[in-house]
Curated annotation (Swiss-Prot):
Protein name per Swiss-Prot or TrEMBL: DNA replication and repair protein RecF
Keyword terms, alphabetized: ATP-binding, Cytoplasm, DNA damage, DNA repair, DNA replication, DNA-binding, Nucleotide-binding, SOS response
Molecular functions per Gene Ontology: ATP binding; single-stranded DNA binding
Subcellular compartments: Cytoplasm
Gene3D superfamilies: P-loop containing nucleotide triphosphate hydrolases (3.40.50.300), RecF/RecN/SMC, N-terminal domain (1.20.1050.90)
Gene designation: recF
Function recorded in the entry: The RecF protein is involved in DNA metabolism; it is required for DNA replication and normal SOS inducibility. RecF binds preferentially to single-stranded, linear DNA. It also seems to bind ATP.
One GO BP: DNA synthesis involved in DNA repair
PANTHER family tied to this protein: DNA REPLICATION AND REPAIR PROTEIN RECF (PTHR32182:SF0)
Any single Pfam family the record assigns to this protein: SMC_N
Biological source species: Anaeromyxobacter dehalogenans (strain 2CP-1 / ATCC BAA-258)
Family note: Belongs to the RecF family.
C-alpha cells in the first residue's frame, strides 16, 4: 500500500502540511528540532493510532490549538482509501473514507494494509537498554503482524490494573475474580509473542550474517517469560502455566501490590555465539544485531502481507558506521517499499538516491520541496 498524499494540521509543531510523497523514497532534511521526526510520527500515528514516543495524547496537539489532525490517501489492491485521525486532550477519533470507527467502519478495516515500521536512533539501544524497550519492540511488531493485538493488549492492561488494585486493597476473593481474565488475556499475548519470535529468529540470523560477514558469531533470538512460564505449548496449556505462576507468587505479589509474572515482565533475549549480546557484544555487534532485527521484521511482514511495509527511518544513517550505513541504504534501494527518511546531512542519503527520490526541507514546522 502506498501513501499518495498526506495532510497534517496542528500536530506537534506542524501547523499545516500538505505532502505528495514519492512512491519510493521521501527524504526530509533539516536541523534538529525543526519537525522532521514529528512528520514521521504523524504518519506513524495515522497508520497505528499510537504515538511514536510515549506521551499523553494532548502533547501531540500543537501548542495553542484545540486539536490536531492527520489524514492520508492510501492506494492498495482495493483502490484508494482515505484514513484520518483527530486527536485532542480527550482522546482520538479515527475515520475510514469519512466513516467513524464504530459507527460505519471497523477497526480491522481501518488497519488493513497499513503496516509501518519505524527505525530510530533509540532502537540502536535495544540490546543494551532494559527490557521495556524490547517489550515495546515485540508489541509493535506483533501489532503489525496481527492488528487484533491492539485490542488484546488493551484487555490485558485492564485486567492487570484491576488485579494490581485488588492485590493492594481487595479481599482474596476479589483478587481471584480478576486473575482469570488476566490469565486468559496474558496467555494470548504470550502465544502471539512466541509465534512472532519463531518467525523472526531465522530472518535475524540470516540478516546478521549478511551484515557482519561469515566470520561473525551466529545470532540468536529467544523469548524469556517471567515466573518460569514455559510458552512452548498450546494456548490453553500456556494459560494453565501462567495461572500456576500467579498462584505460586500470590503472597509475594500481595506484599508488593504488583503482579510479578506475565507479559509485562517478560524479555526478548538477543545472543551472539551463545552469549548474551547485552553483556558480551561490542557496540558494533550490538548495532548490527539491531539492524538485523529491523530487517527481519520488515522481511517477515513482507512475507506475511505479500508486500513490504511502509518504512519510517529517523536519522538512523548518522548513528551507523559507514559500512552499516551502506548496507542499510543498499537494502532500502533494492526493496520495493515506500520509505520516509530524515537526516541533518543530505550527503549521508544522496549516494543511494534514485531518480524518483523526493527531497524536502523541514524548518520550524514548515515542509518545502527541494531540487533533487
Amino acid at each position: 500500500m502506498k501513501l499518495l498524499s498526506l495532510h497534517v494540521q496542528d500536530f506537534r509543531n506542524l501547523a499545516a502540511v500538505e505532502l505528495a510523497p514519492s512512491p519510493r523514497a521521501t527524504v526530509l532534511l533539516g536541523e534538529n528540532g525543526q519537525g522532521k521526526t514529528n512528520l514521521l510520527e504523524a504518519i506513524y500515528f495515522l497508520t497505528t493510532l499510537k504515538p511514536l514516543r510515549a506521551v499523553r495524547l494532548a502533547e501531540l496537539v500543537r501548542f495553542g490549538a484545540e486539536q490536531g489532525a492527520v489524514a492520508g490517501d492510501f492506494e492498495g489492491p482495493g483502490g484508494v482509501r482515505r484514513v484520518a485521525v483527530q486527536v485532542a486532550a480527550g482522546g482520538r477519533t479515527a475515520t475510514l473514507d469519512g466513516k467513524a470507527l464504530g459507527s460505519g467502519a471497523r477497526l480491522d478495516d481501518y488497519f488493513e494494509g497499513l503496516a509501518s515500521v519505524c527505525f530510530s536512533p533509540d532502537d540502536l539501544l535495544l540490546v543494551k537498554a532494559g527490557p521495556d524497550g524490547r517489550r515495546r519492540f515485540l508489541d509493535r511488531a506483533a501489532f503489525n503482524r496481527w492488528p487484533a493485538v491492539l485490542g488484546e493488549a488493551r484487555e490485558y492492561v485492564r485486567a492487570l490494573r484491576a488485579r494490581n488494585a485488588a492485590l493492594r486493597a481487595g479481599p482474596a476473593e476479589v483478587e481471584a475474580s480478576f486473575r482469570e481474565p488476566l490469565v486468559r488475556a496474558g496467555a494470548r499475548i504470550l502465544v502471539r509473542r512466541r509465534d512472532l519470535v519463531a518467525e523472526l529468529a531465522p530472518r535475524l540470523q540470516a540478516a546478521f550474517a549478511e551484515i557482519s560477514g561469515p566470520a561473525a558469531p551466529e545470532a540468536h533470538l529467544a523469548y524469556r517469560a517471567a515466573g518460569g512460564v514455559d510458552v512452548e505449548h498450546p494456548e490453553a496449556e500456556v494459560a494453565a502455566r501462567l495461572a500456576h505462576a500467579l498462584e505460586a507468587r500470590l503472597e509475594r505479589d500481595r506484599e508488593k501490590g504488583f503482579t510479578s509474572a506475565g507479559p509485562h515482565m517478560d524479555d526478548l533475549v538477543l545472543a551472539l555465539g551463545g552469549k548474551g549480546a547485552r553483556l558480551y557484544g561490542s557496540q558494533g555487534q550490538q548495532r548490527a544485531l539491531v539492524l538485523a532485527l529491523k530487517i527481519a521484521e520488515i522481511e517477515n511482514l513482507r512475507a506475511a502481507l505479500g508486500r513490504p511495509p511502509l518504512l519510517l527511518l529517523d536519522d538512523v544513517s548518522s548513528e551507523l558506521d559507514p559500512a552499516k550505513n551502506r548496507f542499510l541504504l543498499g537494502y532500502l534501494a533494492a526493496l520495493p517499499a515506500q520509505a520516509f527518511l530524515t537526516s541533518t546531512d543530505r550527503r549521508l542519503i544522496e549516494p543511494a538516491a534514485g531518480p524518483d527520490t523526493a527531497f524536502f526541507e523541514v524548518r520550524s514546522g514548515v515542509v518545502s520541496p527541494l531540487v533533487s
